[in-house]
Amino acid sequence: MFKAIRRVFTMIPRIQLTEKETRICNLLKDYTAHYNSLHYGQEPLTLRITGGWVRDKLLGQGSHDLDIAINIMSGEEFATGLNGYLLEHFDKYGVKPHSIHKIDKNPEKSKHLETATTKLFDVEVDFVNLRSEEYTEDSRIPTTQFGTPEEDALRRDATLNALFYNIQQDAVEDFTKRGWQDLQDGVLRTPLPARQTFLDDPLRVLRLIRFASRFNFNIEAGVLKEMHDPEINEAFNNKISRERIGVEMEKILVGPNPILGLKLIQRTHLENVIFLWHGDQSVIEYNRKNWPQTKDVEDIYKKGIFNHHLKNFIHHYKDFLSRYLKLRQAIETKDKSFQQNFLLASILIPMADLKIIALPKKKLNNTLPVSESIVREGLKFNKASSIVVARCVENIAAYNSMVEKYLQSGDLKRSEVGTFLRELRGDWEIVHYVSLMDQYLKYISRKDNVVNIIDKYDRFWNYIQEQNLQDSDKMVPIIDGKRMVKILETKPGPWLGKINDEVILWQFDHPQGTEQELISFIKSILPNYLQ
């Protein structure tokens, strides 16, 4: 006879289902009843929605992640049976059976835990069996087997993520006995002792930090204390892929309260393993042996320079936003990648002017700014983000010099500013903010200087707008190459590219210039390039 499940229904509010969720649950209830009628006397099939969906619904938020745990069979077995049921009852539900995407067990990758995915009423649903897990010392990938609801709840990263919605009972189950209370209190607590939980799977540290920053929750004091453990830090570096770290960090950086996430990272001294300057140990070792700047890079971590900068940035960030409304408006109105890239560039200011050898086997052009390497190789973010972040960090000093030059001269040539902005490839605004942040952090102790610095940068910003230079990177010669060759009655050659550079400068300095005036200018300088 099957083992009875101890029910853990507490005074938790009923979940309000959407119309589509109701249809899905009604279908699953019907199929479950059908299955159990055919297997009378055996342990009944029970379905539970698990994870973030339950948490989000109880918080009154929408959720699109439907993960359904099954007690007596694999996800693939269940989905196959459900599809057969849909074939027989198409008239009742109007749902065509979909192909089942099976994700087999794979001990090398934690994301592959024998899950089956299909669609119900145009909603993607994952089915997986209830699991218990056993870890080894050298991997965060557990050995999994069928488990009870209690075992499945206890293996989760936080009690408030271990709440289950029993579909048949239309009720929330709290097998940890703390999940609902912790959700009400806004407390993140591990179901099992935190130290072993984190050693088993250090990614849980970063996940708790992400949930804290997303919901503005507190991490329970004892759990937070364990996050400081150097052994956890080491396990983090040894057990977790850079891609997994990057996924969590991206969610933190584009989330509603990234500064809280960064604060927790700084407090737990995880910045040295999260913002690693390269993810490939062989590249790291090569640089240590062959590249003198490697010591400078690693000293930034070892001597606490990075941690101190991160702490300083976090401490002053809100004050900076309150003083500089342009940045606040940009964060609120631009794509979320803007917030992510601004934060990353500001965090990585200490890495300015430092490079590493990124491609040891390549003889030429094999170096990369450390800031770009951290984003691309350490966090495994996309190439576009890594380039923008590096462009910001590597141009901090140059941008500040341009601001000072403009203020001292009072009347820079329009072409000088335009050419400089062209070099920033359309990213001048974010470079502006990061360079200003660098100056702000340097002079924050002297309040009068801070006001002065913001005023300087504002005046330069206004000059760019007044001179209509904000789209300098998009400027093209008003006479294209083919027409130019025809007008000048000469053959194309290397001179054409050089003339085009001169044309761009002329157009910057003559915003009202006519085509005829430009032709006269080109003819006047052409002999210099045809010699």
From Swiss-Prot:
A GO MF label: CC tRNA cytidylyltransferase activity
Main subcellular location of this protein, as a coarse class: mitochondrion
Impact upon substituting residue 67 to A: Eliminates incorporation of CTP and ATP
Keyword terms of this UniProt record: ATP-binding, Cytoplasm, Mitochondrion, Nucleotide-binding, Nucleotidyltransferase, Nucleus, RNA-binding, Transferase, Transit peptide
The keyword Transferase appears for this protein: yes
Location in the cell: Mitochondrion; Cytoplasm; Nucleus
PANTHER family reported in the protein's UniProt record: CCA TRNA NUCLEOTIDYLTRANSFERASE, MITOCHONDRIAL, TRNA-NUCLEOTIDYLTRANSFERASE
UniProt function note: Nucleotidyltransferase that catalyzes the addition and repair of the essential 3'-terminal CCA sequence in tRNAs, which is necessary for the attachment of amino acids to the 3' terminus of tRNA molecules, using CTP and ATP as substrates. tRNA 3'-terminal CCA addition is required both for tRNA processing and repair. Also involved in tRNA surveillance by mediating tandem CCA addition to generate a CCACCA at the 3' terminus of unstable tRNAs. While stable tRNAs receive only 3'-terminal CCA, unstable tRNAs are marked with CCACCA and rapidly degraded.
Family that this chain belongs to: Belongs to the tRNA nucleotidyltransferase/poly(A) polymerase family.
Name the record gives this protein: CCA tRNA nucleotidyltransferase, mitochondrial
Organism the protein comes from: Candida glabrata (strain ATCC 2001 / BCRC 20586 / JCM 3761 / NBRC 0622 / NRRL Y-65 / CBS 138) (Yeast)
Underlying gene: CCA1
